[in-house]
Amino acid sequence: MNVEGITWHAIVLDPEPFAATKALLIETFSIAPAVDTEGFALFHLANGTMLELYAPQAVPEYGYNDDGVAFGFRVDDIEAASAAVEAAGCELLGQITRMEQLAYSYRDFRGPDGRVYGLNEQK
């Protein structure tokens, strides 16, 4: 499984879910952090998209919205990605949905922080 991209998002997490989510990205998705400091991790993908994880003490002064954030990981093999996140202890939500006319498939999962994320594959 290869992760091909995501859109930029910043997510604020309590310390325990911060660590678990960072571990999921590094160990399961094999994404190395471009920046990894106390309470902050920046993941920069080859296509230029970024994900920033913040623990509460590292949030910028201007803060972030209090509402939930969801985004999708574009992967090259949605079946392998589904198996990998499930093996990492994440809950798969629903079945893989295939939209043949768009050559697009997707599935959601609940990450270690309790948020819903997506997996998507474009052929």
Region locations from a protein language model:
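Conserved short beta-strand elements that form part of the metal-binding/catalytic scaffold
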Residues: I31-D66, V116-Q122
